[in-house]
């Protein structure tokens, strides 16, 4: 039996870093939501083999233990003494190293899919706990939908989904090191977003308040070092997005837009100078294990 699983990207509507913890991680508080830009994971049993094979049409996707989907399969095999092999085919649509949790979502989709393929019977909560061992964003990606993430990002509290709107994303042709961004973050000199205000706006389904409440403390570092990201933000505002923010540590910038005609204007304007531009919708529902 082959199994196909969708692996949607996420954006951060609000991202705050509170302090650096004794274990070296940063304590964060953020609101994340999934969007309808997704990779496709296909899981293919390998009868008679006890191996994990990863293939992708994208040459930037590693095919070994550096790949988070590979790590997800390896973790399940080791934890539950699975002696079955699997091929993991990853069709990439989410840009790589973009601040959209593409690798984490691939890992989460692999966990959900192998839970079914190998008949492990794990709950979403149990899968998320396993996912947190792989990476901070994997736990959220197991759940999907919209949630507040705390701790180092692995403590997930699901909340209501925002009202439907367009999300236009633009990724400049640069890579940003998340570790470097956190290293250069000076918490005493940044403006901290009001994450609770974002949660309240979502619960009230108040689109205007959501747009007013977007914020990302990591912009303070990335925008200074990468003027291309700041330029995309400026242009997205100029073309008419209702709210504009960098996702994660960057470099992808997204705009929230309510109306179709304005979305088209923003999308077309950005396509004039940026190769990787996407117009997608927010995804309201959480993942099901069915």
UniProtKB/Swiss-Prot annotation:
UniProt superkingdom: Bacteria
Keywords, in A-Z order: ATP-binding, Isoprene biosynthesis, Kinase, Nucleotide-binding, Transferase
Enzyme class: transferase
Molecular function GO labels: 4-(cytidine 5'-diphospho)-2-C-methyl-D-erythritol kinase activity; ATP binding
Transmembrane segments: none
GO biological process: isopentenyl diphosphate biosynthetic process, methylerythritol 4-phosphate pathway; terpenoid biosynthetic process
UniProt-annotated binding residues for ATP: 95-105
Residues of the active site: 10, 137
E.C. designation(s): 2.7.1.148
Pathway(s) served: Isoprenoid biosynthesis; isopentenyl diphosphate biosynthesis via DXP pathway; isopentenyl diphosphate from 1-deoxy-D-xylulose 5-phosphate: step 3/6
Family: Belongs to the GHMP kinase family. IspE subfamily.
NCBIfam families listed in its UniProt record: ispE (TIGR00154), PRK14608.1 (NF011202)
Protein's job: Catalyzes the phosphorylation of the position 2 hydroxy group of 4-diphosphocytidyl-2C-methyl-D-erythritol.
Protein known as: 4-diphosphocytidyl-2-C-methyl-D-erythritol kinase
Gene for this chain: ispE
């Amino acid at each position: 039996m082959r199994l196909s699983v969708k692996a949607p990207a996420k954006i951060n509507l609000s991202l705050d870093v509170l302090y650096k913890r004794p274990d070296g991680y940063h304590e964060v508080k953020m609101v994340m939501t999934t969007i309808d830009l997704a990779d496709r994971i296909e899981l293919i049993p390998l009868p008679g083999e006890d191996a994990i094979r990863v293939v992708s049409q994208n040459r930037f996707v590693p095919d070994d233990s550096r790949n988070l989907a590979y790590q997800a399969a390896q973790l399940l095999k080791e934890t539950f003494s699975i002696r079955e092999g699997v091929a993991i085919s990853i069709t990439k649509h989410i840009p790589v190293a973009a601040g959209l949790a593409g690798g984490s979502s691939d890992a989460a989709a692999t966990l959900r899919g192998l839970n079914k393929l190998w008949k492990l019977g794990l709950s979403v909560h149990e899968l998320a706990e396993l996912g947190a061992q792989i990476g901070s964003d994997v736990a959220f990606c197991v759940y999907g939908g919209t949630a507040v993430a705390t701790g180092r990002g692995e403590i997930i509290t699901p909340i209501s989904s925002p009202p439907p709107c367009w999300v236009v994303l633009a990724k400049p042709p640069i890579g940003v090191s998340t570790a470097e961004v956190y290293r250069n973050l000076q918490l005493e000199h940044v403006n901290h977003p009001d994450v609770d205000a974002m949660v309240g706006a979502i619960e009230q389904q108040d689109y205007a308040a959501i747009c007013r409440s977007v914020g990302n403390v990591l912009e303070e570092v990335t925008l200074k070092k990468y003027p291309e990201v700041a330029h995309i933000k400026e242009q997205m505002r100029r073309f008419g997005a209702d709210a504009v923010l960098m996702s994660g540590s960057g470099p992808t910038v997204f705009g929230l837009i309510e109306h179709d005609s304005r979305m088209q204007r923003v999308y077309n304007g950005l396509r004039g100078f940026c190769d990787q531009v996407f117009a997608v919708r927010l995804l309201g529902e959480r993942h099901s294990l069915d």
